[in-house]
UniProtKB/Swiss-Prot annotation:
Localization annotation: Mitochondrion matrix; Peroxisome
Enzyme type, top EC level: lyase
Calcium among keywords: no
Catalytic activity: (3S)-3-hydroxy-3-methylglutaryl-CoA = acetoacetate + acetyl-CoA
Domain Pyruvate carboxyltransferase stretches: 33-300
Name used for this protein in its record: Hydroxymethylglutaryl-CoA lyase, mitochondrial
Active site (catalytic residues): C266
GO biological process annotation, one example: L-leucine catabolic process
Enzyme Commission number, as recorded: 4.1.3.4
Modified residues (N6-acetyllysine): K48, K111, K137, K179, K324
A Pfam family of this chain: HMGL-like
Pathway noted in the entry: Metabolic intermediate metabolism; (S)-3-hydroxy-3-methylglutaryl-CoA degradation; acetoacetate from (S)-3-hydroxy-3-methylglutaryl-CoA: step 1/1
């Protein structure tokens, strides 16, 4: 009994320390998070069955109604490469433009930029990578050559007063190269920032990252680029998306990409889950007292709508749980 009595205070001290650590971690969280909804573009682009234009438009309008302030609407790529995005101009022209909401579109080159602007785009996104092999297999050039292509886009965007967002894929791992050096991610991110991208989204393309790897990567990147110019884009292939996102928030990132209903698979891991579900992200942020401006019920309705249209189950744990209640 005496031994147990002596052991108890030590255990209590341990619990108190744990509580203190987690409280101090929570103190570093942002009061507000901007969610960039990528479902209509990143989520739908790999769907085998073509989604009708009216369905895409209704989905985006429902997401706007839910209070999301940034909704990536479509991609101005060649229909030859991404047939799902062939109706990009019709979608961008057909959606309701809500005040205070931006509707960026992804573009691969200057031709895509010009088509996007002609369709009324006010913001565009460009896509790079921290992996040489991934870049070579995706766009058939080196990282340096890809930036030469981006240069023309950024100059044209500046002249047209169009905001440009950059994506860096494979920041926590590559399907071809494996581990990626944090220094390489920092180098590529710094290049995007110095060229004029107002925000750079750091993507864990194959979802292999863990909070420790996320911390190391962000520590390197934040030595070159201010946290206010960074976003994270986590995939849930290994179930780490929310944990990695929380680590990024604790380190000062306040912009997070996510996809309604978790739309968007990982093309490098058959059957694996893809994007972080927006519903799950909002639920976590609300639980932490972080403002998002998003109405979770309306968001769930948007997720339910698109899942019915696709004849598939949602990947959102929150949506799955609430439909059972």
């Amino acid at each position: 009994m005496a031994a147990m009595t002596k052991a108890l205070p030590r255990r209590l001290v341990g619990l108190a320390s744990l509580r203190a650590v987690s409280t101090s971690s929570m103190d570093t969280l942002p009061k507000q998070v901007k969610i960039v909804e990528v479902g209509p573009r990143d989520g739908l682009q790999n769907e085998k069955n073509i989604v009708s234009t009216p369905v895409k438009i209704k989905l985006i309008d429902m997401l706007s109604e839910a209070g999301l302030s940034v909704i990536e609407a479509t991609s101005f790529v060649s229909p030859k490469w991404v047939p799902q995005m062939a109706d990009h101009a019709e979608v961008l022209k057909g959606i309701q433009k809500f005040p205070g909401i931006t509707y960026p579109v992804l573009i691969p080159n200057l031709k895509g930029f010009e088509a996007a602007v002609a369709a009324g785009a006010k913001e565009v996104s460009i896509f790079g990578a921290a992996s040489e092999l991934f870049t070579k297999k995706n766009v058939n050039c080196s990282i340096e050559e890809s930036f030469q292509r981006f240069d023309a886009i950024l100059k044209a965007a500046q002249s047209a007063n169009i905001s440009v967002r950059g994506y860096v894929s494979c920041v926590l791992g590559c399907p071809y190269e494996g581990k990626i050096s944090p220094a390489k991610v920092a180098e590529v991110t710094k290049k995007f920032y110095s060229m004029g991208c107002y925000e750079i989204s750091l993507g864990d393309t194959i979802g292999v990252g863990t909070p420790g790897i996320m911390k190391d990567m962000l520590s390197a990147v934040m030595q070159e680029v201010p946290p206010a110019a960074l976003a994270v884009h986590c995939h849930d292939t290994y179930g780490q998306a929310l944990a990695n996102t929380l680590m990024a928030l604790q380190m000062g990132v306040s912009v997070v990409d996510s996809s309604v209903a978790g739309l968007g698979g990982c093309p490098y891991a058959q059957g694996a889950s893809g994007n972080l579900a927006t519903e799950d992200l909002v639920y976590m942020l609300e639980g932490l007292g972080i403002h998002t401006g998003v109405n979770l019920q309306k968001l769930l309705e948007a997720g339910n709508f698109i899942c019915q249209a696709l004849n598939r189950k949602t990947s959102s744990k929150v949506a799955q749980a609430t439909c059972k209640l």
